[in-house]
């Protein structure tokens, strides 16, 4: 049963853990773009820009959505673009495995934060890799990977 005491965990998850998972995800895209010679910028959230630190923009509704934009890649082929699209999921998976290994080896103690973080990261990876179109201008990472590998179509973010 969801009670009043669960509200703190819910707010913690919704306002801290989920945005952290999103930041790691878009950082993965940006890192892969950087590896292949592109310059990425990160937008965390939706709405008006609250704060800009270097290439990172924090928006007013920071806990909903996030995305990475990047320019031309110096190494620009189907494989490099697919790795840029997969970079977010790779970073999420790396953090999932790292946290689990640190807990298994008693470096970290199991607690609610790590449970929620791994849960949200797994959820994020699963839905990012589903090959679906969210709208006419927005596709999942899975669909972007499929289209670039199959047809050579590069996915552009229009925001």
From Swiss-Prot:
Cell location: Cell membrane
Membrane topology recorded in Swiss-Prot or TrEMBL: Multi-pass membrane protein
Keywords tagged on the record: Cell membrane, Membrane, Transmembrane, Transmembrane helix
Primary residence: membrane
Bilayer-spanning residue ranges: 16-36, 84-104, 112-132
Gene Ontology cellular component list: plasma membrane
Name of the featured protein: Uncharacterized membrane protein YwmF
Gene that encodes the chain: ywmF
